[in-house]
Every structure is written in C-alpha cells, then in structure tokens.
C-alpha cells in the first residue's frame, strides 16, 4: 500500500471548485456525472489536456492556451474522437472555467471522452462528451521540490512503445502505464520514476519530460522513444536557446543518467524541477544545478507574466 504520508499529500493538493463545464453548459461540480457504462471508462478511449492559469500582474492568464487547445484537437483526431464543438467554444469554456470559479491560479483539465452507447471495442453509436474542470492545485511534486529537487528511481515498467500507441497525443488509456510507474516509485520511497523505452534508452518520467545536462550540453530523449511531445518541453528548449544552450534530441542510456551533471523534469503540472538522485545515487552535487535553476527561473518569470516575452505566451482569462 501507499506510504501514508504520501497518500495524505496527494489527496490534500486538490481543492474542489464550484462549477464544471460539461457538454456545453456549466453544472455544479457534484452534478458533473457520467454513466458507469461510458465507453471511455471501460476502454480508456479518451484524451485530455493539462493547462495552468496564474495570477499575473495584468490579471489571471493562461499559458500557451492555443497550443494546448490545438493539441487537444490533434489528440482527439488521432484517437478518432470527433469533438462536437469548435476550438473557439472550447477555448472560451477553458477561460470561463477559471473566471466563474473565481480562481486566480488554477490547473485546468479539458477531457474528451466517449459516453454510453453500444458496448465493445468499436465505438459505434457512441456520443463524444467534453468537459472542462478547473481547480486550485499546488506544486505537483511538492512545495519543496523547486528548491530541493526530487529523488527518483528507474522504473521496472517500460514506456509503451510508440508502435503501440501515439506518444504525441495525451490518451487516457496510456496513462495506466504511467500510473504503474508512479505507484511503484512512491511505494519504494521515491518522488517519481524514470521510464525506459525500447532499446534500453530513456523515454521520460512517469508524467514528465526529462532533460540531461553534461558539460553544458543539454539532451532530451526524442519522441520516437515514447516521450510525449510536451508543450513545456518545447518552451524549455526555447528558453535554453535564449540562454545560449543548444538542446539536442538524443538517446539517453542508464550510464548517461548516472554520469550527468544535471537532470531535470518538465511538464505543465511539474513545471521545471531538478532531479537530484537516481536509485539513491546523487546526480552532480546532489542539488538542482546552475543551468537547471537558470532555466527554471526564466520559465517562472515567463509564465508569471514578468518577462518581456510573456505576452507571446499568455492569454488573459477576462
């Protein structure tokens, strides 16, 4: 079973809001219900996004909103889910979910899923449902992770092969794989896990992209390993370039991990977090490194609206 302290923390960080947008209208959180016979509940046939809104100086703003909406539609198309709303409708629902719930900072979860219809793998005569929830959610890996970094293990679970699923899409069913890795890591006293793909090369964390730094060279696994084409990943590559560091997509081995000067995770929920040990072995100095910290600080300046280029990435909620 889970370590009690870890379970308490995981349950504590989510605060329910008042309203959820469901199929074109806002309903009370408690009334946002679907049938237990929903196709997605049985077969994992859904897609989702994770988006953050922050309390910026010009007002509550959402980071890379259009990119997230684009990926939601691309993910849905890849999994044969025909979203019954235009992008403008979903974009407005996302903004309204933050505004109507009176949130200044929020995590936002659009979800596209098959409802109840004919049972069986082939979703015949099955409606496509869409929901958007927004709530106050703190640091995914803990409040101290930004300063102290996280301790991870190499997971016994391999990342699903890109020949078996679509790594560029955020498919609901694929996260069973991630959940196995996360549970196993926490049960063994770690904060998270690094997952390998085919060919014994690194793919990503349980739900984050991974970057490695050696001799000031930044490397991240290519998408072909099964890594998600993360929006934060893309942002970090842009930030690294602005700081004078080129990022290359290259295979990373187990040996590379232990010889790294720095490692860090990226993701919308995770943000930019240093990985300070792997399987109990310190990485570099055993603390988040200088390049990791520089990228993290720049990232936080941008997403909080404090950088001159922030306006290129942020959308005001109201």
Pin down the residues of each PLM region.
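Short secondary-structure junctions
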Residues: 99-106, 245
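N-terminal amphipathic/basic-hydrophobic helices that include classical n-h-c signal peptides
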Residues: 1-13
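Helix-start/capping segments and mature chain N-termini
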Residues: 11-85, 89-96, 119-318
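Hydrophobic, Leu/Ile/Phe/Ala-enriched alpha-helical segments that form helix-helix packing faces
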Residues: 2, 98-101, 240
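Short, internal active-site loops enriched in acidic
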Residues: 113-118
């Amino acid at each position: 079973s889970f370590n009690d302290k870890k379970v308490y923390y995981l349950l504590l960080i989510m605060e329910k809001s008042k309203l959820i947008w469901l199929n074109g209208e806002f309903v009370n959180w408690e009334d946002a219900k679907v049938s237990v016979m929903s196709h997605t509940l049985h077969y994992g046939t859904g897609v989702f996004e994770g988006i953050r809104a922050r309390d910026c100086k010009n007002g509550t703003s959402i980071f890379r909103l259009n990119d997230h909406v684009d990926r939601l539609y691309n993910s849905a198309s890849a999994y044969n889910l025909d979203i019954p709303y235009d992008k403008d409708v979903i974009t407005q629902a996302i903004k309204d979910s933050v505004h109507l719930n009176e949130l200044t900072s929020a995590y936002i979860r659009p979800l596209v899923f098959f409802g109840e219809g004919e049972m069986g793998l082939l979703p015949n005569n099955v409606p496509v449902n869409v929901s958007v929830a927004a709530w106050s959610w703190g640091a995914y890996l803990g409040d101290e992770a930004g300063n102290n970094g996280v301790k991870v293990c190499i997971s016994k679970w391999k990342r699903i092969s890109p020949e078996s699923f679509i790594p560029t899409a955020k498919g609901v069913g694929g996260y069973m794989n991630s959940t196995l890795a996360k549970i196993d890591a926490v049960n063994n006293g770690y904060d998270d896990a690094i997952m390998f793909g085919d060919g014994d090369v690194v793919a990503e964390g349980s739900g984050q992209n991974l970057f490695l730094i050696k001799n000031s060279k930044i490397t991240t696994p290519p998408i072909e390993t099964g890594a998600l084409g993360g929006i934060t990943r893309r942002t970090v590559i842009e930030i690294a370039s602005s700081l004078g560091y080129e990022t290359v997509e290259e295979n990373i081995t187990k040996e590379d991990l232990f010889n790294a000067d720095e490692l860090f995770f990226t993701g919308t929920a995770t943000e930019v977090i240093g990985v300070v040990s792997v399987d109990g072995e310190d990485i570099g100095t055993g603390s988040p490194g200088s390049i990791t910290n520089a990228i993290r600080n720049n990232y936080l300046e941008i997403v909080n609206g404090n950088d001159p280029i922030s306006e290129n990435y942020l959308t005001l909620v109201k």
